[in-house]
């Protein structure tokens, strides 16, 4: 509680990992409260996942997460693919609430994959503004979500809700991909594509500029307030 974590090596790997090395016992009741996390370099800032076993009842509450890339990291192209992992392999049960996230150079803020994953992001303030100097993305070479990639399940296991989200990226970027649910959020966006392959999209306010479809291959799209202009981003 109240700790500050700085990983400023600008290296190719390393971060804070909450995981279990064995399936013989479970790890439970892990809390980070009112902490600050700073990261320069590749790999995640924070990763929570069961790995060889299970981690349950993990809570991140009132914390702040900052991507603070040094010039050394940028010159070496040491930027994270995933900024925060909330589930990957093994069994994961994690909740992130009342947190602040600020990112720039990472490919995707949240990785929330795995059939045995339950991850909820609730009431958070999330901002990612891709710098003009960052290499442009090609939708033919990947989904390129800025906010999150989920586990493609319709059981409510990977959810982002009740949050304030600001995203700015190039014409090959989309908001999110394969979440169980995106609901009750306010999104201010400027990017190429919207929400894709998400099982429930409800009660969101979506404002800004999107070049292509706002919703693509989504089910359960209802009660959203969409105020979006279509445009073409240079580059």
Predicted regions and their residues:
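Short, solvent-exposed loop/turn segments that connect beta-strands within catalytic domains
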Residues: 11, 23-26, 53-55, 71-75, ...
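Extracellular beta-strand-rich solenoid/capping regions of secreted or surface-exposed proteins
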Residues: 18-25, 50-52, 85-88, 112, ...
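Short glycine/acidic-rich loop motifs that flank beta-strands on beta-rich extracellular proteins
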Residues: 9-16, 37-48, 68-81, 89, ...
């Amino acid at each position: 509680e109240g700790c500050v974590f700085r990983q400023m090596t600008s290296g190719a790997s390393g971060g804070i990992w909450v995981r279990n090395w064995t399936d013989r016992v479970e790890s439970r009741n892990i809390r980070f409260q009112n902490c600050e996390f700073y990261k320069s370099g590749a790999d995640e800032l924070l990763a929570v996942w069961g790995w060889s076993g299970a981690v349950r009842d993990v809570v991140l509450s009132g914390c702040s997460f900052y991507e603070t890339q040094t010039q050394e990291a940028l010159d070496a192209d040491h930027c994270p693919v995933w900024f925060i992992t909330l589930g990957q392999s093994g069994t994961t049960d994690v909740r992130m609430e009342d947190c602040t996230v600020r990112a720039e150079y990472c490919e995707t803020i949240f990785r929330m994959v795995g059939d045995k994953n339950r991850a909820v992001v609730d009431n958070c303030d999330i901002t990612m503004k891709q710098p003009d100097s960052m290499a442009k993305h090609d939708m033919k070479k990947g989904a390129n979500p800025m906010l999150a990639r989920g586990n493609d399940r319709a059981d409510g296991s990977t959810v982002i809700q009740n949050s304030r989200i600001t995203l700015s990226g190039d014409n090959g970027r989309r908001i999110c991909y394969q979440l169980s649910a995106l609901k009750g959020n306010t999104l201010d966006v400027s990017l190429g594509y919207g929400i894709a392959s998400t099982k429930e999209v409800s009660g969101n306010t979506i404002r800004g500029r999107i070049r292509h479809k706002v919703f693509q291959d989504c089910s359960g799209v209802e009660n959203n307030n969409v105020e979006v202009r279509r445009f073409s981003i240079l580059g």
